[in-house]
Amino acid sequence: MSGSATASPPAKPDLPSSDGAGLTPDAQCPYLLEISHISKGFPGVIALDDVQLRLRPGSVLALMGENGAGKSTLMKIIAGIYQPDTGEIRLRGKPISFTTPLSALQAGIAMIHQELNLMPFMSIAENIWIGREQLNGLHMVDHREMHRCTAQLLERLRIKLDPEELVGNLSIAERQMVEIAKAVSYDSDVLIMDEPTSAITETEVEHLFSIIADLRSQGKGIIYITHKMNEVFKIADEVAVFRDGTYIGLQRAESMDGDSLISMMVGRELTQLFPQREKPAGDVLLSVSDLSLKGIFQQVSFDLRAGEVLGIAGLMGSGRTNVAETLFGITPSDSGEIRFDGKTVRIGDPHQAIELGFALLTEDRKLTGLFPCLSVMENMEMAVLANYAGSGFVQQKALRALCEDMCKKLRVKTPSLEQCIDTLSGGNQQKALLARWLMTNPRVLILDEPTRGIDVGAKAEIYRLISLLASEGMAVIMISSELPEVLGMSDRVMVMHEGEMMGILDRSEATQEKVMHLASGHRVH
């Protein structure tokens, strides 16, 4: 990347010293940012308890911990969204406090949130410079200058987007890149990235890592929150671990391995992340022949046995999710045959799929799974409510007993069934949604990105459940973008590329190299 990764921004306003503007580095301090004895509580919850953290200039600090460990709360304090109850923040060696996110931005701290915060009906340029618009001599917004600055910024970040394109027309991955460009545009010394690769492709991940490397070479400090351990060992200089609102420790990334990192995160050793299972010996339950959906995927064929876990791998846009949605009747196929339990079936809608014995856990639990304003019980009972209703009455007692039983079996951690599901951790939300579908007694369970956005401890729980269900004879289709997960859990792996089925690998022959080769569109000979 040539030159600096920042464009010449529209002029910044003068900053009040009380918000930390104009801080000069302390020559005696080796740290860019220091967090000392920070505590933060909410009604009935201690989110952070006497935590500490330090960030060196020109380094990447990975922040790891299970959901609910306090990572996001601490980042929101650093970014000025929350104020701590006790403790001190030092920036460039000087004590500082932020009363608003704007004051943190003006002091040189920018945060890229996991939940994107762009305005869909505004252009890329307008989103990047909102609140900092360049004015012309008539004190009107100078759109030409904003376009120039944006084009320069995007070019230096090698982001190939039109500054005038509406953000609403962009893919999730492209919006993520705009968020990154916006944060870089502030020329901040500290950048906080919260799960920045959760919705982007492998190619875009590499692009992001090259941007991070460039920013690091300029002396920027980057705090990188992720659940993906391979990313930690690829780009992080140091790793800080949080657990249950407390600071566990900080180590050089090069001195750690996956096992030691997991042990620090969960407080116990996960000796076997992927449970050992016997090879399934059940009969063929589902047979798919030449299944096609015009313009999306074509001639997909596979058999699925009772008790088998079939993994589906492929890059974003390969058609994996579309195949799952077709099997569940969301988008019925144009051609091909589906045989279920020896009989040819036509699945025209999800209701038919559920009646046959199919269940689908969708890839985006927030968008297509959860009813965030409803309780845990209301979310869990959604798929079976009709079975417990009649003559104007709902069998609440029987439903409650069923939900309580599923919570115990799946180890869903919630204060009560009446708790708003939006307050649970990602892992517990996912287990509650899995419980919803298990209550329908499915014979084929389709899981689309079952562990996306959940911590390693919750992942181990999901893997245990999948293994248990398969051992009881349930047929499982698991779609995942995480290759170790696909290889560790699947009896066979089907690989797709741009709507085409490239091949099916047996567990004994499946490797990351072979899967990626197929996923990139190359046949394995």
UniProtKB/Swiss-Prot annotation:
A single MF term (Gene Ontology): ABC-type D-ribose transporter activity
Subcellular location: Cell inner membrane
Region (Disordered): 1-20
Pfam family, one: ABC_tran
Membrane topology: Peripheral membrane protein
EC id: 7.5.2.11, 7.5.2.7
Keywords: ATP-binding, Cell inner membrane, Cell membrane, Membrane, Nucleotide-binding, Repeat, Sugar transport, Translocase, Transport
GO CC annotations on file: plasma membrane
Residues covered by the ABC transporter domain: 33-269, 279-523
Binding-site residues for ATP, renumbered to this chain: G65, E66, N67, G68, A69, G70, K71, S72
SUPFAM superfamilies given in the database record: P-loop containing nucleoside triphosphate hydrolases
Keyword check for Transport: yes
Known catalytic reactions: D-ribose(out) + ATP + H2O = D-ribose(in) + ADP + phosphate + H(+); D-galactose(out) + ATP + H2O = D-galactose(in) + ADP + phosphate + H(+)
Function, as annotated: Part of an ABC transporter complex involved in carbohydrate import. Could be involved in ribose, galactose and/or methyl galactoside import. Responsible for energy coupling to the transport system.
Family recorded in the similarity comment: Belongs to the ABC transporter superfamily. Carbohydrate importer 2 (CUT2) (TC 3.A.1.2) family.
PANTHER family: CARBOHYDRATE TRANSPORT ATP-BINDING PROTEIN MG119-RELATED, GALACTOSE_METHYL GALACTOSIDE IMPORT ATP-BINDING PROTEIN MGLA
Name of the molecule in the record: Putative ribose/galactose/methyl galactoside import ATP-binding protein
Organismal lineage: Bacteria, Pseudomonadati, Pseudomonadota, Gammaproteobacteria, Pseudomonadales
